[in-house]
Each structure stands twice: as structure tokens, then as C-alpha cells.
């Protein structure tokens, strides 16, 4: 059993964040330039809308994350701050808009993600493919990571991603098997593993996944999830601290200590991952450009 955590005593208690979760405000010339561009042209990035703690660091390295297919999700995951409900009509101009944003911001490495669109027959996979194509046309030097939904495991939809060949394809497990139904009620642990394995088996050179800690998982469950990901051929894993977006979301059960994150990094590397990003403030796209190597 994992005891290297700082417990939160009750479901309703919201304790102050430990010192290792406090971050400095982003600064620097490159960050300021990009911040001004985003504000001037009303560019939409997850970095800003999600108030990512790593925004300044990533932008300074020329990396940013964009969300497509609207901002309303058909799923209601207990950890996620994205709105849920009836999504907007598909904007077929969105691929060009995202590509232009990347060009304006002079992004070297772009991460693209999306809400789940279970309301669409193709689950959004056509817009996904068109977005990658548009980015390639307008930004031929920019490398790409696509952080995709599970597309309900539909291989034809996953094939559309494979056909446009992003440098990295990521799909997040989010949590351990025991907690999957509670944390990702419309998702399935084994289906997510199958998606990752299918990507690797069908030509994606670099696959990636991420998990959050602090939802009540035990150390042995985290290690088993890492083993499952390696068995599926995953190359890169990110491990970070879950933070409750609002009182309506799942509570934080534990604040994981820096020493425990370092332990998981060591275990992950021993299991054979090419890269393991493991610390409290790590998010899916943290140090994303490094994962090309």
C-alpha cells in the first residue's frame, strides 16, 4: 500500500495546496510575445483556457496546445473541467483556423486535442484528419502531437489519424483500472489500452499516454497501469497530480509527494518507456517536443 502521500481528510475538505504545487507567474520575452498574439487575434489554446501551470515554460520552448471540435463534450468525466452537454455544430473551417493560429504564433511543435464527439457518426475523426492536413500545408516545419479521444474503439476512425501520420499520437488512460468507471464513466480501461496498441501496431512511431494521481489509487495499481501501457507498446508516459476543477468534480484524495513522483519515474524508465514525465505539475503536453526523440 502506498503511504507516501499527503491525505485529504474528507470528501468536502479542500485543503491548501502543498508548497510543491505552487507556481510562479509565467514571464519571459517569448511568453509575452505569444500572450500578446493570443489576445490580439483571440486565438484559442488549452494553455490559456485551462490555466495550465506550465504555460510559460512551454510557450518559451515554442510549444502550445489547441482544442478542436468545440468546447462542449458529450462525456461527463468526473475529473474534467470541460463543459458537458449538447455540442455545437461542427465548424468545417476550424482546421484552417487552427493552422493559421499555429502560423501566427510561430509554433515549432503543436499539440492538438479535442472534446469527445460521440454525437457524430465519425466521432469527429474527419475534422481531426483535416486539421492535421491543414497544419501540414500551412506549417510544413511544425511537428505535431495529436491527443485523441478513444473514438469508442472504432478502427476506421482511428485509421483516419494513422493515415495523416502525426509524429506523436497520444491517448490518456487518466487513472488506474479500478477507478476508471468512477473517473471516466463513459470510457473503458481495456478499450483505451486497445486503442494505444492498435496505433502502435499500425505504424505510429511514437505513442504516448498520461495518468493523474491523487484520486485514491494505490502504488501497486499505478505500477500495474505502467506495465499495461508498456505491454501496449506505449513509448512515453506523463504522470501528474489531479487537481479538482470545482466542487462539482471528484475530490482530491491525496497530494502525492515529489519523492513518490520520482519513484514512479524510476520505475517507468526501468519498464522501458523512452520518456517518463513524473511530477506534480506535469500535464499531458508537458515537454511535448522532447518526446519526438
Swiss-Prot record:
Its EC number is 2.8.1.8. [4Fe-4S] cluster 2 binds at residues 73, 77, 80. [4Fe-4S] cluster 1 binds at residues 47, 52, 58, 285. The lineage of its organism: Bacteria, Pseudomonadati, Bacteroidota, Flavobacteriia, Flavobacteriales. It comes from Christiangramia forsetii (strain DSM 17595 / CGMCC 1.15422 / KT0803). Residues 59-274 form the Radical SAM core domain. This is Lipoyl synthase. It catalyses: [[Fe-S] cluster scaffold protein carrying a second [4Fe-4S](2+) cluster] + N(6)-octanoyl-L-lysyl-[protein] + 2 oxidized [2Fe-2S]-[ferredoxin] + 2 S-adenosyl-L-methionine + 4 H(+) = [[Fe-S] cluster scaffold protein] + N(6)-[(R)-dihydrolipoyl]-L-lysyl-[protein] + 4 Fe(3+) + 2 hydrogen sulfide + 2 5'-deoxyadenosine + 2 L-methionine + 2 reduced [2Fe-2S]-[ferredoxin]. Keywords: 4Fe-4S, Cytoplasm, Iron, Iron-sulfur, Metal-binding, S-adenosyl-L-methionine, Transferase. PANTHER family: LIPOYL SYNTHASE, LIPOYL SYNTHASE, MITOCHONDRIAL.
